[in-house]
Amino acid sequence: MNNTLLLIILNFVGKIFSFVREMIFSFTYGTGDITDAFNTSTTAATLIFSVITYALSKTYIPTYNEVVKNGDEKSGDHFTNRLLDFMLFLTTLMMILGLVFAPFIVKLFAAGYSGEKLKIASLFMRAVILTIYPNVYAAIFSAYLQIKGDFLTPALPLVIMNILLGLTIMVSKGNVVIMAVGIFLAYFLQYVMFPRATKKAGFRREKISFGLDPNVKKLIILSLPTTFTMAAVYISTIVDQSFASIVAPNGGVSIVNYALKILRIVSSTFIIPFQITAYPIIGKLVANGDIKGMKDLTGQSLVKIMTLFIPSIIGLMVLSEPIITFVYYRGEFTYQDMIATSQVLFYYSLYLIGPALADLLYLSFFSHQNTRVPTIIAFIQLGINIILDFVLSKAYGLVGLALATTFSQFAAVLMALIAYYKYFGKLNYPYILKNIGKIILAGGVMGAFAKFFFAIRPSNLWLLVTIALAGLIYVGLVYILKVDEFDQIIAAFKKKKKKLE
């Protein structure tokens, strides 16, 4: 729990810097062409990276554990070296293709782009594509360091990147070349801490060899379905962005991205830390054949996530307009932009329940080296999302895209729960539902208070007061209602506080 708490704090700090960066961006560029180009290009390049890095992060840990179990830690390091060699070869090919075909890739993500807007987006994308080496390096060694118990180093890149991007936006003043150079430096230098950390963990680089190691070959075969899983998720994102660029050609992509960036603060702060710390433990439980322990940990992690996550969703929905006003409404970001973004944020908020549940359930499948089930679910979800995008965007515009994503994600959760029951048996549903019921009750009271209290004196300062008081009310209610996992969260905070003292 202490590692989870540390990750929550670090992710929150990173997202504060992300918030500041977005405030600077919205003030400087609003929802204009440069903002659209930046959002589309960085999203496109990042999603391409993530298809690979996600597959590596989900298949490296179980493969490494198996190699060490059959040999020793030296064997695990040898396997890691051979994997890094193979990925250097693969990413070189990807980088060349990305640099050559950048305009075509941008058009896939935003069919409505043309002329100068397409040129700017292509320039920005090439800047990010050049950083593919450190991205893949970090994907492998983030998992390696987590196995070794270092959860701090993999959490630092977000802070470094957002500081550098914020500085870039401030000094660029509309100069797209300065923006491109700054984007490259931000994405490249965010991983500056990794070489020292891996050396400290005991890793030593071996001489480069491009022979295909049997364990690397096994990981590649294992990761193919996982790659398709992530590809399906990102094809969905491509479709959403393309529809956004058509439904609202002037600023539609930026409006959707501004809303999603706020949601990602909640996701990366409250979901990802629990998954990062739970995954190596689940992997070890599976390796030891402890299926009951795996299911118990999954249920406990789910309740812990929901304890922090449900009130965040309720707060985002109730205070969507004042939150968008506080973060973005200044400079080139207009009143119409604020209204449109707050509406999209409201309907996207419920979507986050999907990744919180589905991704946690998938960890058990990945630990069993079963990547087929998550892949099938992801592609069914993709089909549902595309159909709903087409239907709902015609009727409701950008809000329709948010609804389509939300409904398709709920379908994925239902399929994941059915598959989990089929392969591993029941989770402790009475325990889970009892606690989630209490959390929803406490969150509902908190949301009602926040809505009416903010209405007394609407302002940015009053918003902060409202959030603080609503948070205290929620904590008090959860404590009174005796949500099971809440005691562990409080104990971890107290333990961390004593260490700091």
Task: Outline where the language-model segments fall.
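Transmembrane helical elements of multi-pass membrane transporters/channels
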Residues: 2-26, 186, 190, 194-198, ...
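Membrane-proximal transmembrane or re-entrant/amphipathic helices at the cytosolic face
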Residues: 452-501
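Helix-loop junctions and terminal segments of transmembrane helices
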Residues: 54-70, 271-302, 362
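Interhelical loop/hinge segments that connect adjacent transmembrane helices in multipass membrane
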Residues: 195-233, 292, 422-440, 491
